[in-house]
From Swiss-Prot:
UniProt-recorded name of the protein: Arginine N-succinyltransferase
Pathway involvement of the protein, from the record: Amino-acid degradation; L-arginine degradation via AST pathway; L-glutamate and succinate from L-arginine: step 1/5
Lineage, uppermost ranks: Bacteria, Pseudomonadati, Pseudomonadota, Gammaproteobacteria, Enterobacterales
Native source organism of the sequence: Yersinia pseudotuberculosis serotype IB (strain PB1/+)
Gene Ontology molecular function, alphabetical: arginine N-succinyltransferase activity
InterPro entries: Acyl_CoA_acyltransferase, Arg_succinylTrfase_AstA/AruG, Arginine_N-succinylTrfase
Top EC category: transferase
Family statement: Belongs to the arginine N-succinyltransferase family.
């Protein structure tokens, strides 16, 4: 069975192995054991309530119970930019006009921005390539919304997600080559790694404080502004079906888009509801679990011992029938409450 749970210290080796499969461009999961260990500790301290909001970050793992192995991760930062500045480019417009010359021209620009300061961030989503099947990807991504819905008081009014921008097969970023290289004089992979391991002071020190004219960039760079890496396209689609949208903000390194939404308007947050657990052995004649039913995310409401699974079911009343195996995976007993939401919007066919 596949289940999502909070990260534990014993997961470090598996997460380090996962980090080696991410490739260039995933700044929040560098293959650095010391950094990953610190990230795990920060998550544990977040659950213990010992950190300020600007330091808090939840880290979840997708575990294959049969193999006893972590095969994916996803995370939520509670409030970005409160300790270290949060940078991106806002894609804007400057108008150059002259009545005397009868000239009026709109020029696209990139403005260095801290506009998302204080927002909650969905981040660090990565799934082992061998497990990119059976709806594991949407499960790992959207389960964060059930956690947010259950513990809404901990999160901002807005949620954002930075999408990995385009890089070629050699790990080269056209956007970086046309923008970042001129200011940093280092390779994209190096800047990416420094940012991912928390060494971000160089961004504030070296990034331009004045708007950049998009027309001055190479055509190859202009073409990838707001575009995602091919491997990230499914993750973007998952979030867009939940209501997150691109609003003209891009990553300062690779030009990838930032998606955003009002937290309470996210479909899985808004539509999630509670059900009372009934535990029964499997009987197809009187049991709600049905391979032809709708896929649902199901999670307990235990803050420190959060658990979530994916199941097929037909909802007929305020109860949710679980097998003993599913109840054990969730850490719930008969009469407990669970939170549930369909994996996809009802009108979305999958």
């Amino acid at each position: 069975m596949m289940k999502v749970r909070p990260v534990e210290r014993r997961d470090l080796a598996d997460i380090f192995e996962l980090a080696g499969k991410t490739g260039v461009g995933m700044t929040s999961l560098p293959q650095n054991e010391q950094h990953l260990a610190a990230r795990i500790e920060r998550a544990l301290n977040t659950w213990q309530g010992s950190l300020d909001p600007g330091e808090q970050g939840y880290l979840f793992v997708l575990e294959d119970s049969e193999q006893q192995k972590v095969v994916g991760v996803s995370a939520i930062e509670v409030a970005v930019g409160l300790n270290d500045p949060w940078y991106n480019f806002r894609v804007g417009t400057l108008v150059h006009a002259s009545k005397a010359l009868n000239v009026y021209k709109s020029v696209p620009t990139l403005f260095l921005s801290n506009d998302h300061t204080g927002y909650s961030e969905l981040c660090t989503l990565f799934l082992d390539p061998d497990y990119r099947k059976d709806k594991n990807g949407p499960f790992l991504s959207k389960v964060r919304f059930l956690f947010i819905a259950a513990f809404r008081q901990y999160f901002s009014r807005k949620v954002i997600a930075e999408m990995r921008g385009y890089t070629d097969e050699q790990g080269r970023s056209p956007f970086w080559e046309s923008v970042g290289r001129h200011f940093f004089s280092i390779e994209f992979a190096k800047a990416d790694y420094l940012s991912g391991t928390g060494q971000k002071a160089f961004i504030a020190e070296l990034m331009p404080k004045h708007p950049l004219y998009v027309d001055f960039l190479a055509e190859e760079a202009r073409a990838v502004i707001g575009q995602v890496h091919p491997h990230t396209a499914p993750a973007r689609a998952v979030l867009e079906t939940e209501g997150l949208q691109y609003q003209g903000y891009v990553d300062i390194f690779d030009g990838g888009p930032t998606l955003e939404a009002n937290t309470d308007d996210v479909r899985a947050v808004r539509d999630s509801s509670k059900r009372t657990v009934v535990i029964k052995d499997y009987d197809i004649e009187d049991y709600d679990i049905d391979p032809n039913g709708r896929l649902y995310l199901v999670a307990n409401d235990h803050y420190h011992h959060f658990r979530a699974i994916l199941m097929n079911t037909h909802l007929s009343d305020e109860r949710l029938r679980l097998t003993p195996e599913s109840a054990e995976a969730l850490g719930v007993a008969a009469g407990d409450s669970v939170r549930i939401v369909s994996l996809f919007a009802p009108e979305t066919k999958r």
